[in-house]
C-alpha cells in the first residue's frame, strides 16, 4: 500500500511538473535574472517525455527479450557450458560507457534515436541477464521435482513453475536497468535523439543553468515513478503475497 501511494504521489508530481514548467517563466526569471531566455521553449516537455519513454521502453524491452532468452538457454543442459562465455561478453559490453557506444554507432547507423537504442540496450543486458540467471537458480529443486512427478513436460515446467517463481528477481533486474536507462537516455540528445536531455544539452552548451534544471527535474521524477511502478509489480509477483 505504501509503495502504491508513493507511485501515485510521484505520478501526480510528474504531471504537475510537466503542466507547470511551460508557465514557470516568471519563477525562472526571478531565479536567473541574468538570463534573457530562462525558459526552454523549443519543444514541449510532454512530447519530450513521451519520446524519452519510447527510447527507454524499446531499448529495455529488447534487452529484456535478449537477456532473459540468453539466461534461459544457459540454464538448460544444452547451453550450460556457455554461461561463463555469456557472462564475460556481458561484462565487456558493460565496461563501455554509453557515450562511447554512441560515438561508435553514429558513423555506422547515423544520428537520431537508433544509436541511442543500441547503446541503452547493450547497457541493460548485464543487469537483466544476471537477474534472470539468479532468479532461475533460486527456484527450489523441490518445485521442479514436484512438477516432474505430476507429469509436466520441460516446457510446462518452465512456464508454470520456473518463470513464475523467478519472476520477482527478474523484474528487479529489469527495474534496475530501466531506471539506469532513464538517466542515461538523456545523453542520447547529444546524437540528435529527442529526449528530456535536450534542455540539459542546450543548457550546458549555452551556459543556461535554468534549462539544465528544467530537463533534469522531469528525468529525476520519471526515474522515481518507474522505480515505484516496478517495485509494485515485483511485490505483486512475489508468491508469498498470494499465499
Named regions from a protein language model:
Residues 1-61, 238-243:
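N-terminal, non-cleaved signal-anchor transmembrane helix
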Residues 5-9, 18-22, 137, 213-243:
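C-terminal transmembrane helix and the adjacent membrane-cytosol boundary/short C-terminal tail
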Residues 44-59, 106-127, 166-167, 211, ...:
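Loop-to-helix entry region at the N-terminal start of transmembrane alpha-helices
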Residues 69-105, 130-137, 145:
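Cytoplasmic-entry segments and transmembrane alpha-helices of multi-pass inner-membrane transporters
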Residues 107, 184-219, 238, 243:
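Glycine-rich helix-loop "coupling/hinge" segments at transmembrane-helix boundaries
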Residues 122, 154-188, 214, 219, ...:
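Transmembrane alpha-helices
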Residues 136-142, 146-166, 192-194:
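Short helix-to-coil transition segments within interhelical loops
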Amino acid at each position: 500500500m505504501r509503495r502504491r501511494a508513493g507511485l501515485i504521489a510521484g505520478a501526480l508530481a510528474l504531471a504537475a511538473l510537466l503542466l507547470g514548467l511551460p508557465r514557470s517563466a516568471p519563477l525562472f526569471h526571478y531565479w536567473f535574472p541574468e538570463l534573457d531566455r530562462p525558459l526552454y521553449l523549443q519543444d514541449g516537455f510532454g512530447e519530450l517525455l513521451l519520446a524519452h519513454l519510447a527510447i527507454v521502453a524499446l531499448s529495455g524491452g529488447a534487452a529484456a527479450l535478449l537477456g532473459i532468452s540468453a539466461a534461459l538457454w544457459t540454464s538448460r543442459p544444452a547451453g550450460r557450458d556457455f554461461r561463463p562465455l555469456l557472462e564475460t561478453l556481458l561484462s565487456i559490453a558493460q565496461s563501455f560507457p554509453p557515450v562511447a557506444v554512441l560515438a561508435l554507432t553514429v558513423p555506422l547507423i547515423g544520428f537520431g534515436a537508433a544509436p541511442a537504442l543500441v547503446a541503452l540496450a547493450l547497457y541493460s543486458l548485464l543487469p537483466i541477464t544476471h537477474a534472470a540467471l539468479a532468479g532461475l537458480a533460486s527456484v527450489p529443486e523441490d518445485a521442479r521435482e514436484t512438477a516432474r512427478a505430476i507429469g509436466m513436460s520441460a516446457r510446462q515446467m518452465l512456464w508454470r513453475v520456473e518463470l513464475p517463481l523467478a519472476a520477482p528477481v527478474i523484474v528487479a533486474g529489469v527495474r534496475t536497468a530501466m531506471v539506469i536507462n532513464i538517466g542515461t537516455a538523456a545523453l542520447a540528445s547529444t546524437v540528435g535523439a529527442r529526449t528530456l536531455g535536450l534542455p540539459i544539452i542546450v543548457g550546458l552548451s549555452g551556459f543556461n543553468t535554468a534549462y539544465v534544471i528544467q530537463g533534469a527535474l522531469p528525468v529525476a521524477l520519471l526515474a522515481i515513478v518507474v522505480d515505484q511502478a516496478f517495485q509494485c509489480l515485483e511485490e505483486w509477483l512475489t508468491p508469498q503475497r498470494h499465499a
